[in-house]
C-alpha cells in the first residue's frame, strides 16, 4: 500500500502581510523585524514640512506662532511690577537703591600700562567723591592687589561690617546712614600708598631695594606719577618690567647671600579728612604697614627658594658638562667641592647615605671605563696583543693626559667613589679606549641590517643566526 502523497506547500504571499486584528477589532502593532533587517518608512509630506520650517524662520510674521500669555495676565505678585521703595537705615531693610548712590564705585587699576597712565577727573576720598579741578592734583595711578582684607584689620570710625543671609559682606556707615558693598579699608589703604613728597612710593622702594643690583647697562628711573620704569642703555629701550625678574639673568647671576631688606622710613601721620580717619589712624597705618612688610617678606622667601632650586638644577648639570669638555677650575674649586659633597650626600643613592662610604676594589675586567658604552659580552680581541687591536680609531695622545688630569680631581670631589685609576694609565688606557669604542659598531653587522638576506629561505636554512619563536 503506497503512502498518501502530501500536498505541496503553498508559497508565501507576496508583499507585506496584512496586520493582524485583535479580538476587539483594533489593528495590533506590526511585528518586530527579524534580526539584521531594517524598516524604512517613507513619508510623502517631508518636503512640505521642511519648507514650512524655513518659512517660519524667514517670514516670522506670516508664520503661525502660538500666542504667548501677556505679562499682566500671568500670576505674578504685585512687587514684580513695582520698583522697591527706599527704606530706613537698618540691617533688615538695607538696600543700595536709597541714599547709598552718592558713593559711585571707582575702579582702581591694579596693573599699569603706558597707554593708561591718566586717571579720570574724579577721585575717591574719605569724605566722598571729589570731582572737578580740585581733584586733578590728587589723581594718582594707584597699585592695589585684588585680595580681600582680613577681618582682624579694624574698620574706620563709624563703620560696621555685616553679612547677608547668603554670606556676602557689606558695610554700614553710621555717619551718614548708608550701606555699601565696598570695603572702606581699601580706600584708606589706597590713600596710604599714594606717593607724596614726604614718603614717595614706600612699597615699591622696598620691593626694588630687596631685589639686588640691576644688570649691566640698566638704570632705574621714576615718572612724575611715581611709577618705576627701567632704561636699557644697550639697545636704548625702556620697559615697565624689572630685568632682575628675568629667568635668564637669575641663571647667570649666582646669589651667595640674600640682599638685606631696607626698612622703609616711618610714614608721616596724615591729617584725617572728613572725620573718617579719627584718632586711631596712626595705629591703622602701623597695622597696614606691618601687613605690607609681612607680604613682602613672604614674597622674598618664595623668590629665594626659586633661585635656590635654579641653582641646584644648574649644578646638577655640571657633571655632564664636565665630562663633555668643561673647564677644570669650575669643578676643582674648594667651594664647588664642598657643594658637590652636600649634593651627593642628599642624593637617593643608598650607599652614599649610609654613612660608611662605599669604596670600589681594583677591578681586573673592563667594568670601569672612560666611555659611556656598556659591553654585554667580552670582545673576541680582548686577549690579543696591542698590535692586533689597532682598528684605526685610536684616541689621540693629546686628549688622554687632559682626561687623566681632569677626572681624578672630579672623582675625588665625590664621596664614595674612591676609584683606583692605576689600571687606566699607559697601554691599558689605550687598549680600553680602542676596545670599547667600536663595540657598538661590531654588534650591528651588515647581516642584521640586510633585511632581504635574513628573510630569504636559503639564508634561514643554512646561515640563520636568529631564533624564531
Swiss-Prot record:
GO BP, one annotated term: DNA damage response
* Annotated segments matching region Transactivation domain: 273-469
Q: Which GO terms describe its cellular component?
A: bicellular tight junction; cell-cell junction; cytoplasm; cytosol; female germ cell nucleus; membrane; nucleoplasm; nucleus
Where on the chain is N6-lactoyllysine found, per UniProt? Answer: 75
| Residues with Phosphoserine modification | 46, 90, 94, 112-113, 116, 146, 271, 320, 333, 347-348, 354, 363, 366, 369
Q: Where is the composition biased (Polar residues)?
A: 345-357, 365-375, 393-405
Show the segment(s) annotated as Disordered. 1-47, 76-99, 258-290, 345-405
State the coiled-coil residue ranges: 71-85, 280-325
List the molecular function annotations (GO) for this entry.
chromatin binding; DNA-binding transcription factor binding; proline-rich region binding; RNA polymerase II cis-regulatory region sequence-specific DNA binding; transcription cis-regulatory region binding; transcription coactivator activity; transcription coregulator activity; transcription corepressor activity
Xref: Gene3D superfamilies: 2.20.70.10, 6.20.430.10
Q: What is known of its domains?
A: The first coiled-coil region mediates most of the interaction with TEAD transcription factors.
Supply the PANTHER family for this chain. TRANSCRIPTIONAL COACTIVATOR YAP1, YES-ASSOCIATED PROTEIN YAP1 FAMILY MEMBER
Annotated function: Transcriptional regulator with dual roles as a coactivator and corepressor. Critical downstream regulatory target in the Hippo signaling pathway, crucial for organ size control and tumor suppression by restricting proliferation and promoting apoptosis. The Hippo signaling pathway core involves a kinase cascade featuring STK3/MST2 and STK4/MST1, along with its regulatory partner SAV1, which phosphorylates and activates LATS1/2 in complex with their regulatory protein, MOB1. This activation leads to the phosphorylation and inactivation of the YAP1 oncoprotein and WWTR1/TAZ.
- By what name is this protein known? Transcriptional coactivator YAP1
Species for this entry: Rattus norvegicus (Rat)
Per the UniProt record, the lineage of the source organism begins with: Eukaryota, Metazoa, Chordata, Craniata, Vertebrata
Provide the gene name from the record: Yap1
